[in-house]
């Protein structure tokens, strides 16, 4: 996971020395908005936007889910990067269709030649203005949720105003402890930092499991944005985070209520097709040579996600 410094690519891993061994994630560098209003800089139009994703990445997975749920597959096209993220960062197996680039860092410098920062996915590109709209997944899914409704006719709302406070509270709790918590655990470089993140992670999972013992979903009786933001971490947990990131107190399959909830979400039409366990396992185990220097990718585990979820 390298970075750009004033437009020049550098193959450098995360520096945890100044943070006492703790992994600290950088903020997204592009945070503009598509808005359904006349005269706006970024208006919702069919075919105007292009999404760059990794099938391995939980943050990018969010955007693929919302693209599917909100009937945007015919309106926003996609480039999928290779699962291997080596010295050149995220790369394409074939030149991507807009500029013929083969590296994600070239997309960033296409938008801003002197860009400095990490080169991450997802990236939402605007073909009309030739720039990146956003590389912040939480904001891309909000745009997909609400700003294309007139175009698609799909008014399903995963961030309804009456539940917004609850959704935000869950998001604010789950992001540091679970979504980013698995990375804080796996990328920690001191025992103290690892154990701090590990304990917070499993405390949060215990809280979620207890909540799901009494509630159908996180914010109530309907699936919301908070559930999908949690899902993309849960679905990777037993496949990679338990072993690769040393998050091994319990598997998700050991949590009675979370496991049923995970299976229910996975079995919703179209969601399985956004989930690729080959890419997930290959990326983490093969790319993170500082954690897994042999680059051996495990054959297992066997995941039971398609049997009845038992949640009514």
What is each model feature region?
Residues 1-312:
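C-terminal alpha-helical interaction module
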């Amino acid at each position: 996971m390298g970075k750009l410094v004033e437009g020049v690519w550098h193959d450098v891993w995360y520096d945890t020395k100044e943070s006492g061994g703790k992994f600290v994630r950088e903020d997204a560098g592009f945070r503009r908005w598509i808005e359904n209003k006349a005269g706006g800089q970024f208006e919702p139009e069919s075919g105007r936007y292009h999404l760059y994703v990794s099938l391995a990445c939980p943050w990018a997975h969010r955007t693929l889910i919302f693209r599917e749920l909100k009937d945007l597959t015919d309106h926003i096209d996609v480039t999928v990067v290779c699962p291997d993220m080596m010295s050149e960062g995220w790369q394409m197996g074939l030149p991507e269709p807009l500029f013929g680039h083969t590296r994600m860092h070239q997309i960033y410098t296409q938008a801003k030649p002197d860009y400095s920062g990490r080169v991450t996915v997802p990236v939402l590109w605007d073909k009309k203005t030739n720039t990146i709209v956003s590389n912040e997944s939480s904001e891309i899914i909000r745009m997909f949720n609400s700003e294309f409704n007139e175009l698609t006719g799909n008014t399903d709302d995963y961030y309804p105003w009456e539940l917004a406070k609850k959704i935000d509270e869950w998001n604010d709790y789950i992001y540091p402890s679970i979504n980013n918590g698995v990375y804080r655990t796996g990328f920690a470089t001191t025992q103290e930092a690892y154990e701090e993140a590990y304990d917070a992670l499993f405390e949060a999972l215990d809280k979620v499991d207890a909540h799901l013992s009494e509630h159908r979903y996180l914010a109530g009786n309907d699936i919301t944005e908070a559930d999908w933001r949690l899902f993309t971490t849960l679905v990777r947990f037993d496949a990679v985070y338990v072993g690769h990131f040393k998050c091994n107190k319990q598997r998700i399959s050991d949590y009675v209520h979370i496991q049923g909830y995970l299976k229910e979400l996975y079995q919703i039409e179209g969601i399985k097709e956004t989930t690729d366990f080959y890419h997930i396992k290959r990326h983490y185990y093969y790319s993170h040579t500082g954690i897994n220097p042999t680059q051996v990718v495990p054959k297992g585990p066997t995941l039971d996600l398609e049997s009845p979820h038992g949640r009514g």
